[in-house]
Amino acid sequence: MPRKGPVPKRDVLPDPIYNSKLVTRLINKIMIDGKKGKAQKILYTAFDIIRERTGKDPMEVFEQALKNVMPVLEVRARRVGGANYQVPVEVRPERRTTLGLRWLVNYARLRGEKTMEERLANEIMDAANNTGAAVKKREDTHKMAEANKAFAHYRW
């Protein structure tokens, strides 16, 4: 903990093409070893693929996908009298978007298509249609929270 109070959150700059901070955050999630140019190329190509296949604005598809992937509840481990309980808690809005972006990118990486552009485009389109691995992760997270509802009174 710093002595001078809470450290202010750094704000990201909106990306040059779509003028969106969400897109910048997605680019940062895709980026490996500081190669931002490569990450941008991957995302913009993926967006072109989405535009080509759906005929819709890729930003709308992406926002819908993110909305379908963002979790509302999650479980957190809480130690009570020598036992660990999985306590369901509500996810804060900032963490909600962070988890949504992280899951989209991680599950896109695990897909079988040849290039990352195709994987990302397909994962985003699947998520927009409420299918795909990232949406399944959200459903599993909600199921876990629902199953452990009995421990909700241990919230902190």
UniProtKB/Swiss-Prot annotation:
Entries under NCBIfam families matching the protein: rpsG_bact (TIGR01029)
Alphabetical list of InterPro entries matching this protein: Ribosomal_uS7 (IPR000235), Ribosomal_uS7_bac/org-type (IPR005717), Ribosomal_uS7_CS (IPR020606), Ribosomal_uS7_dom (IPR023798), Ribosomal_uS7_dom_sf (IPR036823)
Family: Belongs to the universal ribosomal protein uS7 family.
Its biological purpose: One of the primary rRNA binding proteins, it binds directly to 16S rRNA where it nucleates assembly of the head domain of the 30S subunit. Is located at the subunit interface close to the decoding center, probably blocks exit of the E-site tRNA.
One GO BP annotation of this record: translation
Organism for this UniProt entry: Anoxybacillus flavithermus (strain DSM 21510 / WK1)
CDD domains: uS7_Bacteria
Subunit and interaction comment: Part of the 30S ribosomal subunit. Contacts proteins S9 and S11.
Keywords of this entry: Ribonucleoprotein, Ribosomal protein, RNA-binding, rRNA-binding, tRNA-binding
Keyword Kinase: no
Name recorded for this polypeptide: Small ribosomal subunit protein uS7
SUPFAM superfamilies documented for this protein: Ribosomal protein S7 (SSF47973)
A GO molecular-function annotation: tRNA binding
Keyword flag rRNA-binding: yes
Any Gene Ontology CC annotation: small ribosomal subunit
Source taxon at top rank: Bacteria
Pfam annotation, one family: Ribosomal_S7
